[in-house]
């Protein structure tokens, strides 16, 4: 009987397990032949992975490029949206506001105007109603078959508007050249030089008269906003007899136009000659708004009566338009309407100006009211120090111990009312020169510059600020001082005890330029040089600068009259000057009228 082990061995005798050692050898043999296949599989896997990575990179690049393009397009869209937003805010919103204003505000106003127009048209055909025909449209073209009772108002208003429309281009050209600064810039570090030139007046009426043997005396010129005006006494050569009976009063007005080399040209457009028997020995002048106005008297001092007992004399009023043959050319004697306290006024050959259809002049006035303020000013100033004026017992121009006041003459030029000369007064700095006052318009203030000329080489003159409104005031500006000994509103003009310069034979008026900076000019007839000369002094008190320039004369003589009127043209100072002198060689009197130009320049400027 076989044991267990023998049974097992017999079972596996023909089985593979019995040859297990051989089988293992065969298995090792087969395992040795597998590595090439594995490497091939691994290589394929590696290639697949690299392909996947390449595909992934390409896709990533495409996605990045797509994102960048999308970002660019998005940015462009945002910029376009922002531009549209700004267009809406900056353009459409204001446009909508304008449309809203037009529809909500102006359209109802226009409809209301149309309604009023229709009502006025309808009213013209109502014969039972009276109308005011002062509207220019009804003056020019009244309805047919309607009887209209016209006055001079329609003619004057229509002519004035037509003239203003025609003259506007000339005035604008002149104004654009008359507001500059004549001085070099503040950066000037070198020497300032001045160059002067003299020009004749070729197309002026007065020059044509001077060129003949006729004599012109006491010429007065005023310039305002591109318009000039003159008045003077003419002694024709064909008249014989007493000199005083031969004087003819002449007025002229015209434009300041641009001429050759852009220089100004005073072109006469209208003039008026008063008959010999007219009361026009002494005349003021005012120019503005295309009009000349003048007040004329036979005697400078005018007595004013306030009751019916006195016979009040009239003052001759002359108005002249820029063009002739219009209702604005008129001569009329007017009875003045003075303040009850004004007893006398002193009219001289001095200038004013026209503003808002009102001609205004300044004159010395004698008033009956107590002058305690002025007297106290003098008494307190003279207690401790002796000023030259402290020894005066008579005051110009009226004489006697009463100080003159400041008088203002206003003449409304409204064609709808009659001419009326109103006289008011106020107090101010003490007046030492009674020859007269010039009144210049201030382009920046609701007032004017009141100037009193120097006199006899001892009084330097005076420049005050005078208001134009109903509240008439005079405030000192330059060439005055407040004495330490006095208190309150006390101002005195500068005066010296002796003549400061004996080589100065005569002095002109003080002229304030129509510039933004306060600048004034004065001229003198000087004999200190080898040749006689007219010397100009230009002052700017605010910037504390001043310049001089001398125009040497080819003649020598003794002057008895010197008058200037200055304006700015292309940043240069231009002055119209008129002077009379008695020639030393012939003892004959000669009148000279011309234009002078002073150009200031700087040698070098700071960078």
Swiss-Prot record:
Keywords: Glycoprotein, Hemagglutinin, Host cell membrane, Host membrane, Host-virus interaction, Membrane, Signal-anchor, Transmembrane, Transmembrane helix, Viral attachment to host cell, Viral envelope protein, Virion, Virus entry into host cell. It holds the Pfam family HN. GO terms for molecular function: host cell surface receptor binding. The keyword Transmembrane applies. One of its GO terms (cellular component) is virion membrane. It is a single-pass type II membrane protein. Residues 59-607 are virion surface. It comes from the Viruses. Disulfide bonds: none annotated. GO terms for biological process: symbiont entry into host cell; virion attachment to host cell. It is found in: Virion membrane; Host cell membrane. Residues 1-37 are intravirion. The chain crosses the membrane at residues 38-58. Glycans are attached at residues 149, 309, 391, 422, 456, 587, 603. Binds canine SLAMF1 at the cell surface. Belongs to the paramyxoviruses hemagglutinin-neuraminidase family. Non-sialidase subfamily. Attaches the virus to cell receptors and thereby initiating infection. Binding of H protein to the receptor induces a conformational change that allows the F protein to trigger virion/cell membranes fusion. The cellular receptor might be SLAM, and may explain the lymphotropism of the virus. This is Hemagglutinin glycoprotein. It comes from Canine distemper virus (strain A92-27/4).
């Amino acid at each position: 009987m076989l044991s267990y082990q023998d049974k097992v061995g017999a079972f596996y005798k023909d089985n593979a397990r019995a040859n297990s050692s051989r089988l293992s050898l065969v298995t090792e043999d087969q395992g040795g032949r597998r590595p090439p296949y594995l490497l091939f599989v691994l290589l394929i896997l590696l290639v697949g992975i690299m392909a996947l990575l390449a595909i992934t990179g390409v896709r990533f690049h495409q996605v990045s490029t797509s994102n960048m393009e999308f970002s660019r397009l998005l940015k462009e869209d945002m910029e376009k949206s922002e531009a549209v937003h700004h267009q809406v805010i900056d353009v459409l919103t204001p446009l909508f506001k304008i449309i809203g204003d037009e529809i909500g505000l102006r359209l109802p106003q226009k409809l209301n105007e149309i309604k009023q127009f229709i009502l006025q048209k309808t009213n013209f055909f109502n014969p039972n109603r009276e109308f005011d025909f002062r509207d220019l449209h009804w003056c020019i073209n009244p309805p047919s078959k309607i009887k209209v009772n016209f006055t001079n108002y329609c003619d004057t208003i229509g002519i004035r508007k037509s003239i203003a429309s025609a003259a506007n281009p000339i005035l604008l050209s002149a104004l654009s050249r008359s507001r500059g600064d004549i001085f070099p810039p503040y950066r000037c570090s070198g020497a300032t030089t001045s160059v002067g030139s003299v020009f004749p007046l070729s197309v002026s009426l007065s020059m044509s008269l001077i060129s003949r043997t006729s004599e012109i005396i006491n010429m007065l010129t005023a310039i305002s906003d591109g318009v000039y005006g003159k008045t003077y006494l003419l002694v024709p050569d064909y008249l014989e007899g007493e000199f005083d009976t031969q004087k003819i009063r002449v007025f002229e007005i015209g434009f300041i136009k641009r001429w050759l080399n852009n220089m100004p040209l005073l072109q006469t457009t209208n003039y008026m000659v008063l008959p010999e028997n007219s009361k026009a020995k002494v005349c003021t002048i005012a120019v503005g708004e295309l009009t000349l106005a003048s007040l004329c008297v036979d005697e400078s001092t005018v007595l004013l009566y306030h009751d019916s007992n006195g016979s009040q004399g009239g003052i001759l009023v002359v108005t002249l338009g820029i063009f002739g043959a219009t209702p604005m050319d008129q001569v009329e004697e007017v009875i003045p309407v003075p303040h009850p306290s004004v007893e006398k006024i002193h009219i001289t050959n001095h200038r004013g100006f026209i503003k808002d259809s009102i001609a205004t002049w300044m004159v010395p006035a004698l008033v009956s009211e107590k002058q305690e303020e002025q007297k106290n000013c003098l008494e307190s100033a003279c207690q401790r120090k002796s000023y030259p004026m402290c020894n005066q017992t008579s005051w110009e121009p009226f004489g006697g111990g009463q100080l003159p006041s400041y008088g203002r003459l206003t003449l409304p030029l409204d064609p709808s009312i009659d001419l009326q000369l109103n006289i008011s007064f106020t107090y101010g700095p003490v007046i030492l020169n009674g020859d007269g006052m010039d009144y210049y318009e201030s382009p920046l203030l609701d007032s004017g510059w009141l100037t009193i000329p120097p006199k006899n080489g001892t009084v330097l003159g005076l420049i005050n600020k005078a208001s134009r409104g109903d509240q008439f005031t005079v405030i000192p500006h330059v060439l005055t001082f407040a004495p330490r000994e006095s208190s309150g509103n006390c101002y005195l003009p500068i005066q010296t005890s002796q003549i400061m310069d004996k080589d100065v034979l005569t002095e002109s008026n003080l002229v304030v330029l129509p510039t933004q900076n306060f600048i004034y000019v004065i001229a003198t007839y000087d004999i200190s040089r080898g040749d006689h000369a007219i010397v100009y002094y230009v002052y700017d008190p605010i910037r504390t600068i001043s310049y001089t320039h001398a125009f040497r004369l080819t003649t020598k003589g003794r002057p008895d009259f010197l008058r200037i009127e200055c304006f700015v043209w292309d940043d240069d100072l231009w002055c119209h000057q008129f002077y009379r002198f008695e020639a030393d060689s012939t003892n004959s009197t000669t009148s000279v009228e011309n234009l002078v130009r002073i150009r200031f320049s700087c040698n070098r400027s700071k960078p």
